[in-house]
Amino acid sequence: DQQVAFDGAKSLWLYGRTRPEECDPLFQEWQKAGLRTQELIWSRMLLSFEQGQYGLLSYLSRQLTTNKNDAKRLLAVYKDPRRLRHKSKYSGSAKINATIVDMGLRRLAKKDLKQAVKLYAKYQKSDRFSDYKGRQLSRYLVRRALIYQTEELRSFVDTMLPLLDSDDLVEMRLRWALRVKDDQQFQRYLPQLSQAKQNSPRWTYWRARILQNGDKQQQQLALQILASLSEQRNFYGFTAANMVNKPYRIQHQTTVIDPQRQLQLTDDRGLARVTELLAIDKQSDARAEWVMLLNRYDKPMQKQYAVYAVTNGWHSLGVQASIQAKLWNDMQMRF
């Protein structure tokens, strides 16, 4: 079907890197049919810009018959994104100006983050971006500032964070505060996390740690939080247990054997193959057969296969079955 082939050609062609030569015959037929439009060429130019493929970007620019001046400006910004400091050249109302500025600032941020933030603020004041684009770009810049924990950009980060409503960025800011031992900033940003994140073991633990640095009332609250956290079976629960001298809560639950379901196992040819493969020490083949076997059954039946494996001393297969059956509380089987 020619239409299917041409649809596939479009999907293949719209890519930010050079495609293999084997694709050329398909692309040529697609182009002859008049389906490679100027809009598509421009879209691929933007993709190649994002991928850092200047050669492809330059080649595509020569295929344009319209918007040649815009293409020249895009190429110029790619080569030197600091050109964006000449704000008047990118202040027109055309949508492409906002696109060039957006992509140029992202590229500049990889070379000179401080300059990128400075220029972003100037363009933002002149309403260069739509609300959505401005939000996405500010998120990108804030993330880079948080990754590098650039002290000179902390005020920018602290101004933008409340506007972005992003748990992952707030968590990065909290880690920054922990690294520099800034309890005040930690207490400022913890409430900006969603309630679910605030109540997670990680941030419950660190809230208690920060409270330990406070007055006696806060220290007492920290002990209460740690005691409660120590009831959980996770890294922070175990760490809290160490801090309050309480035993770890393993919460073991033995998987119950279902005699009726166990009888069904004896008729399973797949299980017979696993048994024979293990007998001749074909461990990899037995494991592959075991995984296929488990995939044929629901969770209740997978539990019984897990029990069968452990009973027969097939410990690695038992662990695999416990994972698929989600037997997270059967500690003896999992470990």
Q: Where are the model-predicted features located?
A:
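Cell-wall glycan-active module
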Residues: 1-335
